[in-house]
Amino acid sequence: MGRRVPITVAEAIRKVMGFANNGLKELLPIELAYGRMLAEDLVADHDVPSFNRSPYDGFAIRAEDTNLASYETPIVFEVVGEIGAGSLFDEKVGSFQAVRIMTGAQIPNDCDAVVMLELTRQYEDNGNDYMEVKRSFKTGDNISFQGEDARKGTVLAKKGSYINPGISALLATFGYSEVPVAKKPVIGLLATGSELLDVNDSLEPGKIRNSNTYMILSQIRRVGGRVKYFGKFSDDFDTCFTAVKDALSQVDMLITTGGVSVGDYDYLPAIYGRLGASVLFNKVAMRPGSVTTVAQLNGKLLFGLSGNPSACYVGFELFVRPCIRAYMFSEKAHLKREKALLGKDLLKPNPFTRFVRAKLTCNEGQLIAYPSGFDKSSSVSSLAESNAFIVLPGGTRGYKKEMFVDVLLLEDNEGSEWLWTFYKRGVSNGAITI
């Protein structure tokens, strides 16, 4: 293999996204739709509310009857009926008459305001019910009007939106007993390395337990994919080639961990060559994860992630995550970006774009990013408490505590559109290459 020439993070992501395709959709019962992605726009097929209704318990009245009401001269209304949620009051409501109304009930035709129960005094006289008010009300006071929440034809949630409890409520409101959701892509996972032990194996000299597999399994599930794990394989070319070839026919995308460096036992580039796959890139100007390699074969993406845990983690979030989200129709496939204060000095120069694992906290409305412990690509411990990446653009000389930095959120379902054009060099006006 010839000398590897690094490309920028932005260029690498752009190349990958050129092969990120939308997937299929399926119908699920509404009770199973939470946590999935909408496969169609959610459009209101009627107004919400579909009638003028009361948001409070109280009395429906004609507002003009209260024009002269005051604390000294309260206005008395005869209570001529009662209406509960789900019921109608069809009788005429005349001057200085009121209808006792419950939260959610439809406003009677002759009424145009609601007096909250706690603003009234109620009493009975000669077998009739009365209530009095000590202030005036305007037409429309305390009424939820038809369509004020949503008008018929309004797009309430876009295709590709994450179905949270609020969207679940909308789906029920508009009668979706079955919900069109994005079908989960099948993501194949294959680990390579003769040094890998199973989780339940005893440690041996020179060996490590296969932690990357379970990390990636969790990342795939977090972003919404379905995992097909093919196992771990020793550093043998023919064995790995056969495993990769067989796996490709069963998945929508394939991830391999390990085998992407330049050592004698790193076979992945040669495997891509024998398969006839087109390598999109094999080196990225970033730390960690510079040897991340991505290829495509007949439009299907093959992600070669580093065997180092942190490099593997970063590679997944930058390159695999957006492809999975795009497959599920998301227009915000990338990690969400925010600004945060740096909680600790990071004075090391950054010749390449650097993604530092971080714990993001919020103090009185201000996000603060604290680097997570030991910062080497082989580190596992720093990943456990990380919920963000601090992004340090290439060409910067380091950052001091309390400087503003960009952070990418890991535990987030909103995502963002293309974000790599936002970065600028410190206080200068020149764009940074990322």
Task: Identify the residue ranges that each predicted region occupies.
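Helix-rich terminal scaffold detector
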Residues: 1-10, 177-305, 309-315, 429-434
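Generic N-terminal segment detector
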Residues: 1-22, 395, 406-413, 417-421
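Short, glycine/charged-enriched hinge/interface segments at domain edges or termini
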Residues: 2-4, 9, 60-229, 373, ...
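Conserved active-site and cofactor/substrate-binding residues in soluble primary-metabolism enzymes
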Residues: 4-11, 25-28, 32, 56, ...
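Intrinsically disordered, low-complexity, positively charged segments
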Residues: 6-68
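Residue-level signal for inorganic ion chemistry
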Residues: 16, 58, 153, 189, ...
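Flexible glycine/proline-rich
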Residues: 28-31, 35, 40, 86, ...
